[in-house]
C-alpha cells in the first residue's frame, strides 16, 4: 500500500487537529509536522496542541500513527563545537522528542548538523555523543531520530550515506536511530537517481539497510546532480523528473515507508493535493503550476 502525504503546517488555534484535517483534505494517508516554527525554538505547551482531537480524527480516517512524522527545527546543530550551544541543542531535542511522543509520533527527522570550523569526523563524533545524551535523557521513550540525507551545502554532514551510517555505528542505542532519504538532497549530493537508480538503491541497502529507513522525502530538484544547492522543485518540474520519482515512490524496497512531499508552494498556495493525485494516478500534469 502507498503511504503518501506532505509537510503540513501546525497553526493556532487548531494546532495538531488542524494539521490532521489538512492532510486528510489533501487525500493523504501520511503527514509530517514541526512542533512549532522550523526557524526557531519557540514552542506552545503540549496541552494546547489539541492532540486528543487530532488523534480521534486520524483514527476515524484510517490515518495510521506509524505514518505520522515529526521534524526538528533547522537551526539545531548537534555538531557545533561550542559546548554551550550544543548543550542547548541537546536539551531542546530531548524536549522535542517528549512533545512528539505525546502526539503519538514515533519518528522525528533531524538534519544531522554542520561541522563549521572543525572537520567531518569531529562533527560525526559530536553528533553521536549528543544523540547518546539525548537518548539517555529520554530513555523512557521509544521515539526514533531519523537522520536525513543532506545536499552538501557548506559544512553539512550527511551528504554521503557513509556519514549517516558512521553516526549510527557510534551511537549506543542504535534502535532509536533511523534514516530519512530526501530525493532532492541525494541528487544534489551527487547520487544520480535519474541515471543510476537501482545501483543507488542497492547502495542504500548495503550502507544504511532498508530496515533502517523510516521516512522518504519526495522532492524534485531545481538544480543538476552534484550541485550541492538543496533547492526543491515541484514533482516532475525539476531535474530528477516525474518518472524517476514514481519509480522511487513505488519501489518494492520502500513499500511500507511513509513518503512525504516538501515541494514549494505555487503562488503562495499548497500544491500537495494535486501532487498527491498525480502520484496516485501516475499521471503527470504539465499544467499544475497554472492551477494556482
From Swiss-Prot:
Annotated Zn(2+) 3 binding lies at 185, 230, 232
Q: What molecular function terms (GO) are annotated for this protein?
A: deoxyribonuclease IV (phage-T4-induced) activity; DNA binding; DNA-(apurinic or apyrimidinic site) endonuclease activity; phosphoric diester hydrolase activity; zinc ion binding
Record's keyword annotation contains Repeat: no
| This protein's name | Probable endonuclease 4
Q: Which GO BP terms sit in this record?
A: base-excision repair
Under the heading HAMAP family, the entry gives: Nfo
What's the cofactor? Zn(2+)
Q: What is its EC number?
A: 3.1.21.2
List UniProt keywords, sorted A-Z: DNA damage, DNA repair, Endonuclease, Hydrolase, Metal-binding, Nuclease, Zinc
Q: What does this protein do?
A: Endonuclease IV plays a role in DNA repair. It cleaves phosphodiester bonds at apurinic or apyrimidinic (AP) sites, generating a 3'-hydroxyl group and a 5'-terminal sugar phosphate.
Binding-site residues for Zn(2+) 1, renumbered to this chain = 71, 111, 148
Per UniProt, the enzyme's principal EC class comes to: hydrolase
The record's Pfam families line, in alphabetical order, gives: AP_endonuc_2
Give the cofactor note. Answer: Binds 3 Zn(2+) ions.
Per its UniProt entry, which superkingdom is the organism in?
Answer: Bacteria
What gene makes this protein? nfo
Q: Which family does it belong to?
A: Belongs to the AP endonuclease 2 family.
Task: List the catalysed reactions.
Answer: Endonucleolytic cleavage to 5'-phosphooligonucleotide end-products
Positions annotated to bind Zn(2+) 2: 148, 182, 217, 262
Amino acid at each position: 500500500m502507498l503511504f503518501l502525504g506532505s509537510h503540513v503546517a501546525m497553526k493556532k488555534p487548531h494546532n495538531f487537529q488542524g494539521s490532521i484535517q489538512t492532510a486528510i483534505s489533501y487525500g493523504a494517508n501520511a503527514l509530517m509536522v514541526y512542533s512549532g516554527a522550523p526557524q526557531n525554538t519557540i514552542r506552545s505547551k503540549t496541552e494546547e496542541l489539541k492532540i486528543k482531537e487530532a488523534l480521534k480524527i486520524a483514527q476515524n480516517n484510517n490515518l495510521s500513527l506509524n505514518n505520522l512524522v515529526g521534524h526538528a527545527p533547522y537551526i539545531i546543530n548537534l555538531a557545533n563545537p561550542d559546548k554551550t550551544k550544543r548543550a542547548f541543542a541537546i536539551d531542546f531535542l530531548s524536549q522535542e522528542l517528549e512533545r512528539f511522543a505525546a502526539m503519538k509520533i514515533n519518528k522525528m527527522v533531524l538534519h544531522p548538523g554542520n561541522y563549521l570550523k572543525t572537520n567531518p569526523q569531529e562533527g560525526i563524533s559530536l553528533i553521536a555523543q549528543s544523540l547518546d545524551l539525548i537518548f539517555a535523557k529520554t530513555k523512557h521513550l521509544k521515539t526514533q531520530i531519523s537522520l536525513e540525507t543532506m545536499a552538501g551545502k557548506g559544512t553539512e554532514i550527511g551528504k554521503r550515506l557513509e556519514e549517516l551510517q558512521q553516526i549510527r555505528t557510534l551511537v549506543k542505542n542504535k534502535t532509536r536511530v533511523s534514516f530519512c532519504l530526501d530525493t532532492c538532497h541525494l541528487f544534489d549530493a551527487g547520487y544520480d537517481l535519474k541515471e543510476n537508480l537501482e545501483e543507488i538503491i542497492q547502495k542504500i541497502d548495503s550502507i544504511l539497510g532498508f530496515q533502517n529507513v523510516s521516512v522518504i522525502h519526495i522532492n524534485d530538484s531545481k538544480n543538476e546532480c552534484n550541485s550541492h544547492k538543496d533547492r526543491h522543485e515541484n514533482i516532475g518540474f525539476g531535474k530528477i523528473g516525474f518518472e524517476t520519482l514514481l519509480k522511487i515512490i513505488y519501489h518494492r524496497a520502500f513499500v511500507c515507508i511513509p513518503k512525504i512531499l516538501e515541494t514549494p508552494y505555487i503562488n503562495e498556495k499548497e500544491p500537495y493535493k494535486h501532487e498527491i493525485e498525480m502520484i496516485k494516478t501516475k499521471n503527470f500534469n504539465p499544467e499544475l503550476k497554472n492551477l494556482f
